[in-house]
Amino acid sequence: MSAIENFDAHTPMMQQYLKLKAQHPEILLFYRMGDFYELFYDDAKRASQLLDISLTKRGASAGEPIPMAGIPYHAVENYLAKLVNQGESVAICEQIGDPATSKGPVERKVVRIVTPGTISDEALLQERQDNLLAAIWQDSKGFGYATLDISSGRFRLSEPADRETMAAELQRTNPAELLYAEDFAEMSLIEGRRGLRRRPLWEFEIDTARQQLNLQFGTRDLVGFGVENAPRGLCAAGCLLQYAKDTQRTTLPHIRSITMEREQDSIIMDAATRRNLEITQNLAGGAENTLASVLDCTVTPMGSRMLKRWLHMPVRDTRVLLERQQTIGALQDFTAELQPVLRQVGDLERILARLALRTARPRDLARMRHAFQQLPELRALLENVDSAPVQALREKMGEFAELRDLLERAIIDTPPVLVRDGGVIAPGYNEELDEWRALADGATDYLERLEVRERERTGLDTLKVGFNAVHGYYIQISRGQSHLAPINYMRRQTLKNAERYIIPELKEYEDKVLTSKGKALALEKQLYEELFDLLLPHLEALQQSASALAELDVLVNLAERAYTLNYTCPTFIDKPGIRITEGRHPVVEQVLNEPFIANPLNLSPQRRMLIITGPNMGGKSTYMRQTALIALMAYIGSYVPAQKVEIGPIDRIFTRVGAADDLASGRSTFMVEMTETANILHNATEYSLVLMDEIGRGTSTYDGLSLAWACAENLANKIKALTLFATHYFELTQLPEKMEGVANVHLDALEHGDTIAFMHSVQDGAASKSYGLAVAALAGVPKEVIKRARQKLRELESISPNAAATQVDGTQMSLLSVPEETSPAVEALENLDPDSLTPRQALEWIYRLKSLV
């Protein structure tokens, strides 16, 4: 900033601003001046564009006019929300000195830094979504990744081994802000993400990280958290914790532990799979018609966030899953009674985070009190549920009768938004406060009595007593009667139609009232802070209670969904395989106006791969996706949309379904498809569920069929993964004859003239034809084009009548058996008669043949 070059030439106020700005050069500085936050120089220009506010000039400093933009302090939350949504960070600078006693500029300092990943204010957060701060670190052995939800205290770390796993983690967690080292090598992995923050290398040092974490948790080492042997994850976690402390400018008592997330604990889904299955976000980027939109009827925001975490991290521990299933079954008869009470609990988790940060507002404490008031009724309802896990949750949620009583005594029923204006602490809570308030409130009675007395004494019927913030208390007389004002009335203000006066008695009372109001407000703020001190020792138990209430909300919700949507409880088996009777797609069945056609599925070690054929729009993709979604739902402990389900162990779910050009990375549709396919072939195991849809369609017929055949062969024979393989290459329907564990199924359709009816029913065996022209006609392709296509199809079929049945083992000509090209050297030798050559000609031929090789 050019302003700093001639620092001494600036006014004292601008010098103070420039010093503070130098400490926060890369973020906007909101500089408090009276009732406004001002921004200057480049900050003002940026803010005017980002917030669409006026850019003006403020006088001159160092001989130059100062670009300036300002926002009213009482509307700051709205502007902060806009900036945070655009990925910006803001340093809030407040006046901390007293203007009355300050010589020169009032003392100011930055009291907090608002960044997209460290916000806890209710107005700035998405209610039903986690808001994560993350840090990423990389060395020669892999990645370290840490996430922190400052609005709940949830702190996690992991060590993704490779780029694909790291990309999947970024997709799953979707951080609002991402910290990375200044020498981070894989920039293409994070480019284009919101809230990127470059940090110095020293912030990622392992020794500093261990020290920071031990200090935060009050421990000597990190062995108890199971993260001691995760150096890359710790490097990321250390940087992240330091950043959180720097921005909050306070202790973070609600962050009490850190958890290691291990690959073997959950079903792994890569970024493409999460996108294709539309778990919490559809392919267009919205939230409608997703799995979460069907399953999430939770009644608390914290329950909704927990359910989404479950959906993105299906659990592999069958003990946990069976416990959840049993709980859902036990709660089905109680959902109608429990949900209305749970709804009243609200977002206790985030209220507790604001309590820990000492930023909780009066209404937060009122909501906490309301949550506590629901606990006795909840505990009474749960007492009747015959389930050990439910009783464990009931114990964990506690009752907090003492804290409820404290808040009932301390906070009025409907407190104002902020404590700064007073009127928060309830009457009767503090004797001294009540006395000061009585003095201040007595003003109304006094003024009414004074007005009546003075009116009678002077005989002036227009006389009235009032108050305003600038001039204090006054006696007002109309302009027509002002010449009759008594001699002891001192003029204070002249208005167009009236005169305002002061008398010694009124001035004396004004001083007394203002003093008592000031004393009452100061005491009220002190008592409010003391409430934090009384509540914070219970923080750990309160956080456990919030977690139990959120889990109860999720399980009650899943019980309600299971009953309402006619879901069934899946059975877990020991061997790999999935057997589904009458399976349905959980999302499609909700948006269809007609009944959903349920279909069976049978995958086992003896039937590992299904080759799925049938017309476009016939339901192949729906059938494949519903299988993956049923598996995912089973592995969060939920009931599933089917008549009966048996499911074996699954370690990963892969999808290669649909694709679009990745223009940002310069990759074509086919390149995207092949990258996803390579990932599957490298990482799938016999316990993986693999969905392959139309592999090889993005290139020539020969190349595409070759790739599809080889991929199917590899998955069935070598990897032995549970695979659904949809294709339009009818040659692939020969695979079951050539290898074990492969079977054909098809989706039925009926053709009548130029029309086609999709039956959406899965049958054994291969489809008889593709119905491509019928689908094209249905899509509105002009009739003359369809007619010409039928002619061309007949021509092609007459040229190659056996194309659909061609074999790939070489016994007859096929699409895959490309004739070998004859080399020029061989052709020349075939035309050569060695008996007719002279020695010289023979030598020339040797050189000529050499040149042809």
Curated annotation (Swiss-Prot):
<keyword id="KW-0238">DNA-binding</keyword>
<dbReference type="Pfam" id="PF01624">
    <property type="entry name" value="MutS_I"/>
</dbReference>
<dbReference type="InterPro" id="IPR036678">
    <property type="entry name" value="MutS_con_dom_sf"/>
</dbReference>
<dbReference type="GO" id="GO:0003684">
    <property type="term" value="F:damaged DNA binding"/>
</dbReference>
<comment type="similarity">
    <text>Belongs to the DNA mismatch repair MutS family.</text>
</comment>
<dbReference type="Pfam" id="PF00488">
    <property type="entry name" value="MutS_V"/>
</dbReference>
<dbReference type="GO" id="GO:0005829">
    <property type="term" value="C:cytosol"/>
</dbReference>
<dbReference type="InterPro" id="IPR007695">
    <property type="entry name" value="DNA_mismatch_repair_MutS-lik_N"/>
</dbReference>
<keyword id="KW-0067">ATP-binding</keyword>
<dbReference type="InterPro" id="IPR016151">
    <property type="entry name" value="DNA_mismatch_repair_MutS_N"/>
</dbReference>
<dbReference type="InterPro" id="IPR007696">
    <property type="entry name" value="DNA_mismatch_repair_MutS_core"/>
</dbReference>
<dbReference type="InterPro" id="IPR000432">
    <property type="entry name" value="DNA_mismatch_repair_MutS_C"/>
</dbReference>
<dbReference type="GO" id="GO:0005524">
    <property type="term" value="F:ATP binding"/>
</dbReference>
<dbReference type="InterPro" id="IPR007860">
    <property type="entry name" value="DNA_mmatch_repair_MutS_con_dom"/>
</dbReference>
<dbReference type="InterPro" id="IPR027417">
    <property type="entry name" value="P-loop_NTPase"/>
</dbReference>
<dbReference type="InterPro" id="IPR005748">
    <property type="entry name" value="DNA_mismatch_repair_MutS"/>
</dbReference>
<dbReference type="InterPro" id="IPR017261">
    <property type="entry name" value="DNA_mismatch_repair_MutS/MSH"/>
</dbReference>
<dbReference type="InterPro" id="IPR045076">
    <property type="entry name" value="MutS"/>
</dbReference>
<dbReference type="Pfam" id="PF05188">
    <property type="entry name" value="MutS_II"/>
</dbReference>
<dbReference type="Pfam" id="PF05190">
    <property type="entry name" value="MutS_IV"/>
</dbReference>
<keyword id="KW-0547">Nucleotide-binding</keyword>
<dbReference type="GO" id="GO:0140664">
    <property type="term" value="F:ATP-dependent DNA damage sensor activity"/>
</dbReference>
<feature type="binding site">
    <location>
        <begin position="614"/>
        <end position="621"/>
    </location>
    <ligand>
        <name>ATP</name>
    </ligand>
</feature>
<protein>
    <recommendedName>
        <fullName>DNA mismatch repair protein MutS</fullName>
    </recommendedName>
</protein>
<keyword id="KW-0227">DNA damage</keyword>
<dbReference type="GO" id="GO:0006298">
    <property type="term" value="P:mismatch repair"/>
</dbReference>
<dbReference type="InterPro" id="IPR036187">
    <property type="entry name" value="DNA_mismatch_repair_MutS_sf"/>
</dbReference>
<dbReference type="GO" id="GO:0030983">
    <property type="term" value="F:mismatched DNA binding"/>
</dbReference>
<comment type="function">
    <text>This protein is involved in the repair of mismatches in DNA. It is possible that it carries out the mismatch recognition step. This protein has a weak ATPase activity.</text>
</comment>
<keyword id="KW-0234">DNA repair</keyword>
<dbReference type="Pfam" id="PF05192">
    <property type="entry name" value="MutS_III"/>
</dbReference>
<dbReference type="InterPro" id="IPR007861">
    <property type="entry name" value="DNA_mismatch_repair_MutS_clamp"/>
</dbReference>
